[in-house]
């Protein structure tokens, strides 16, 4: 497969044999079926149930069992979802057991028991019902990161709530992510699109007499959305709502300078901030180098080095450095939710009210990320060329390959000399041409 990139160089992709070897190496990345949110009839003895209230700026999906898509919705929507988690004897804390086929088996898989769409009044009523069952009346709001479909966010949050064992009312705020590694720009703008909505959700929760305390947990790009929403609230109202006591910033994909500005604008009465960082976070390295951000990412700083050490101490920000923590995540971007020890720590801190990836990525997606270089378009095109044979083998890559092509095509636009023949890449790669 020869790819002309208009830069005077040719490049030949590995053939199917190498692709098969790589696919075997990352076999755990095999895709999962669409439609996992279609409810199953019943669960099994020993399984756990997690009830999640959802507020979303996503557009309703056209396909049954998906509920909401990666497109932007015209207004804030609400849902109430119950997830069944298989018995502890068949799963390790920190993991999500995705069904390989539908319907999923509640004895071994995460499955959906109920998925109701609600209006705002119904959502308020169900919040009241859930807080009545929780003695502490504490709400945990989770805001996911980049490259998350709706079902990714739902099942990951269910895993976090279950594994932390925290007695909280779970509220998921999910924004329109397309669930594609090449839709970074779209996802970033979707967080900006969702700022007012998240601010409104947090304000209404804080004004609800049934709620005593709110903790916000953000991951990756979701941190930008959380910081911007809290910053807006402080500017509008003079301070962040007092019931928002704790904000956990896990692997924040946020420029350090912008984070400083948000901390300052939140004022001295801001919530307690806890920061999870890791210097080996490869996803944040990609964010910095490929997508045009030259500044340091907050989630990848060394908290023991200056000027960060002094700044964090001065701002009274608690830091947990996860660099040495082991993770099954090849990108080291979801350590906060994937390590049993860290999940237990987070649960204890939430229970005590103290300060303290995740997304599924296929083999082809990983190659796209790993080929990233100084020239984003060239790196992306090369990554897709390598990914082409893998897309025939690895289900997750095959599922997202077409989305990658569309996103790349939009990014190339009128770029002169871009002569990548993407439409026939998989067939040509398998034939060795």
Residue ranges and their predicted role:
Residues 5-18:
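Bacterial N-terminal signal peptides that target proteins for export
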Residues 25-28:
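C-terminal motif of bacterial Sec signal peptides marking the signal peptidase cleavage site
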Residues 34-117, 124-126, 131-134, 154-158, ...:
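Lipolytic serine-hydrolase domain surface
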Residues 138:
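Alpha/beta-hydrolase fold active-site loops
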Residues 141-145, 251:
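The conserved beta1-alpha1 loop
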Residues 149-153:
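Short substrate-entry loop that stabilizes the transition state in hydrolases
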Residues 218, 222, 226:
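Gly/Ala-rich beta-loop-alpha elbow adjacent to hydrolase catalytic centers
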Residues 364-433:
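A hydrophobic membrane-anchoring feature enriched in long, contiguous, low-charge segments
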């Amino acid at each position: 497969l020869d790819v002309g990139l208009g830069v005077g160089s040719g490049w030949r992709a590995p053939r199917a044999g190498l692709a098969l070897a790589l696919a075997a190496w990352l076999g755990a990345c095999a895709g999962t079926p669409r439609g996992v949110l279609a409810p199953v009839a019943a669960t099994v003895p020993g399984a756990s149930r997690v009830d999640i209230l959802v507020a979303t700026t996503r557009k309703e999906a056209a396909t049954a069992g998906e509920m909401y898509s990666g497109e932007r919705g015209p207004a804030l929507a609400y849902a109430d979802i119950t997830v069944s988690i298989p018995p502890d004897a068949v799963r390790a804390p920190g993991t999500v057991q995705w069904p390989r086929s539908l319907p999923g088996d509640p004895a071994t898989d995460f499955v959906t028991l109920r998925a109701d769409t609600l209006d705002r009044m119904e959502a308020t009523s169900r919040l009241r019902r859930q807080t009545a069952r929780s003695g502490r009346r504490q709400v945990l709001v989770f805001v996911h990161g980049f490259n998350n479909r709706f079902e990714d966010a739902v099942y990951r949050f269910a895993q976090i709530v279950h594994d932390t064992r925290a007695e909280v009312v779970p509220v998921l705020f999910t924004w329109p992510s397309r669930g594609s590694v090449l839709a970074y720009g779209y996802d970033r703008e979707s967080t900006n699109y969702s700022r007012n909505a998240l601010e409104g959700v947090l304000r209404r929760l804080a004004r609800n007499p049934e709620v005593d305390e709110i903790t916000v947990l953000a991951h990756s790009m979701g941190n930008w959305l959380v910081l911007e929403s809290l910053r807006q609230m402080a500017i509008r109202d003079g301070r962040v709502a007092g019931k928002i006591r704790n904000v956990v910033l896990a692997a924040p994909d946020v420029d350090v300078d912008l984070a400083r500005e948000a901390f300052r604008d939140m004022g001295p009465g801001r919530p307690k901030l806890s920061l999870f960082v890791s210097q080996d976070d490869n996803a944040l390295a990609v964010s910095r180098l490929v997508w045009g951000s030259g500044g340091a990412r907050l989630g990848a700083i060394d908290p023991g080095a200056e000027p960060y050490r002094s700044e964090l101490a001065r701002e009274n920000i608690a830091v947990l450095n996860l660099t040495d923590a082991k993770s099954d995540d090849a990108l080291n971007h979801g350590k906060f939710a994937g390590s049993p020890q860290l999940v237990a720590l987070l649960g204890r801190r939430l229970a005590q009210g103290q300060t303290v990836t995740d997304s599924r990525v296929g083999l082809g997606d990983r190659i796209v990320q790993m080929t990233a270089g100084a020239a984003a378009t060239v790196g992306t095109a090369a990554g897709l060329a390598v990914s082409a044979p893998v897309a025939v083998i690895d289900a997750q890559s095959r599922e997202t390959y077409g989305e990658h092509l569309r996103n790349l095509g939009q990014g190339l636009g009128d770029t002169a000399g871009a002569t990548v023949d993407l439409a026939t890449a998989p067939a040509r790669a398998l034939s060795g041409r």
